[in-house]
């Protein structure tokens, strides 16, 4: 049987039949059909496998009530009035980077309360 004949036979099979063929090949030859995964590095590989635990809090739009948003940004970041105003006026801007999920969601909720649009990345 040639490769073309084998491929032709595989094209005519259903997904269930193909799955059975793959399992039979794995058993027969002692191999796995799983794609090989490149080893990136201990920390990076572990972080990719887990659910994302750190987020960047990004102010995407200040909304209509900029004064309240500026006050909220000052409160959440500890910045001065001038710096907070520059961030709000220059949206989209990152407010905080690598923040724990719970803190990021809390920041997002507080900013949304005063009319700002916030993204967690």
UniProtKB/Swiss-Prot annotation:
Q: Which PANTHER family match?
A: 39S RIBOSOMAL PROTEIN L12 (PTHR45987), LARGE RIBOSOMAL SUBUNIT PROTEIN BL12M (PTHR45987:SF4)
Record-level Gene Ontology MF annotations: mRNA binding; structural constituent of ribosome
**Can you state the subunit structure given in the record?**
Homodimer. Part of the ribosomal stalk of the 50S ribosomal subunit. Forms a multimeric L10(L12)X complex, where L10 forms an elongated spine to which 2 to 4 L12 dimers bind in a sequential fashion. Binds GTP-bound translation factors.
Output the InterPro entries linked to this UniProt entry: Ribosomal_bL12, Ribosomal_bL12_C, Ribosomal_bL12_C/ClpS-like, Ribosomal_bL12_oligo, Ribosomal_bL12_oligo_N_sf
Nucleotide-binding keyword on record = no
Protein's name according to its UniProt entry: Large ribosomal subunit protein bL12
Described by its record, this protein's role is as follows: Forms part of the ribosomal stalk which helps the ribosome interact with GTP-bound translation factors. Is thus essential for accurate translation.
Pfam family name, one:
Ribosomal_L12_N
Family membership? Belongs to the bacterial ribosomal protein bL12 family.
* Gene Ontology CC terms: cytosolic large ribosomal subunit
This protein's source sits in the domain of life called Bacteria
One GO BP on record is: translation
Q: Keywords on this record?
A: Ribonucleoprotein, Ribosomal protein
